[in-house]
């Protein structure tokens, strides 16, 4: 039977999007969200959180289905939640954000940073990384969670419009005071992470990405394609027991070593942050903090992860805005 690889890759991506990704998180509870909008230049996080904790900020309920900010403006959200009394055993509990992510490049998009009430950073949020930890899989709570399971998180949301490259735009001078893009608030949920389901999604992501970059004259190309097809045929979202079978179908091709003459590559995390590109310079300063906070979150998960940031100015901005991660890690 002729295997049409490009068609199967497209099919696999659809399976990932529609039949795997929706099952990665199991929603346990919803949060209460209040917001205050600043259409102009942002306030330093430490100053804002100090005012918020002391009751000097009037947060208003955030409407579902409505834009939550204005172009180049900042919206602060106060997220209140309560962990359920009984949590799924052996599963990480996370706060999952849907701030209205749209299908375009991450750099020109809404972004956010989550803080504890003491002003320390938890991690950043963007369309491809929209969660933060509450309880680890082995039951260790983040210090944002109180002994009774309640928590308050302060989220600095940047309402950045999508500025197209190399074209004339009206969005490049200053905040406009209006929502030029409709990023509609959807939800902030307490959810249990299914690590096996996420790992299956990651396996399929690696396989599809490899097939898109391999030469079809390589025998391994066809072995990967056939294993991918077999795997997604086995996965039935209505029968969780098929997950193990679907992953097993990928085992052999995922663990085969490269040929003897292949180069050995060592991968390293590196942030390419444009200092002055499609956003204000002050937004670059905030992007540096968000990027580093997520790199640190990865280091907490995997001590072998190595991260590089090459611009000295970015380190200076980081120390100015977020001295805590610079000094303690």
Q: Model-found features: residue ranges?
A:
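Carbohydrate-active enzymes and regulators
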Residues: 1-329
């Amino acid at each position: 039977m002729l295997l049409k690889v490009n068609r199967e890759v497209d099919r696999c991506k659809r399976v990932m999007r529609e039949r795997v990704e929706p099952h990665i998180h199991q929603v346990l509870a919803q949060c209460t969200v209040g917001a205050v909008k600043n259409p102009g230049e942002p306030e330093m996080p430490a100053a804002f959180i100090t005012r918020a904790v002391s009751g000097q900020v009037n947060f208003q309920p955030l409407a579902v289905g409505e834009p939550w900010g204005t172009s180049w403006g900042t919206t602060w959200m106060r997220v209140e939640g309560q962990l359920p009394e009984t949590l799924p055993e052996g599963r990480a509990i996370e706060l999952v954000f849907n701030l209205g992510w749209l299908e375009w490049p991450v750099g020109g998009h809404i972004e956010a940073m989550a803080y504890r009430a003491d002003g320390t950073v938890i991690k950043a949020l963007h369309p491809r990384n929209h969660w933060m930890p509450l309880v680890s899989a082995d039951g260790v709570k983040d210090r944002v969670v109180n002994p009774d399971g309640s928590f308050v998180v302060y989220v600095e949301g940047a309402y950045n419009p999508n500025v197209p490259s190399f074209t004339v735009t009206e969005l490049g001078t200053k905040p406009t005071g209006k929502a030029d893009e409709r990023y509609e608030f959807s939800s902030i949920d307490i959810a249990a992470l299914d690590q096996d389901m996420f790992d299956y999604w990651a396996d399929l992501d690696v396989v599809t990405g490899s097939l898109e970059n391999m030469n079809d004259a390589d025998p391994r190309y066809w072995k990967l394609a056939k294993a991918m097809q077999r795997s997604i045929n086995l996965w039935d979202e209505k029968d969780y027991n098929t997950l193990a079978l679907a992953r097993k179908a990928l085992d052999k091709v995922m663990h085969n070593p490269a040929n003897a003459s292949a180069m050995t590559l060592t991968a390293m995390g590196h942030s390419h942050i444009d200092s002055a590109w499609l956003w204000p310079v002050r937004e670059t300063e905030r992007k540096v903090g968000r990027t580093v906070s997520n790199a640190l979150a990865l280091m907490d998960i995997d001590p072998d992860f190595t991260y590089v940031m090459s611009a000295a100015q970015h380190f200076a901005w980081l120390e100015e805005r977020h001295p805590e991660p610079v000094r303690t890690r």
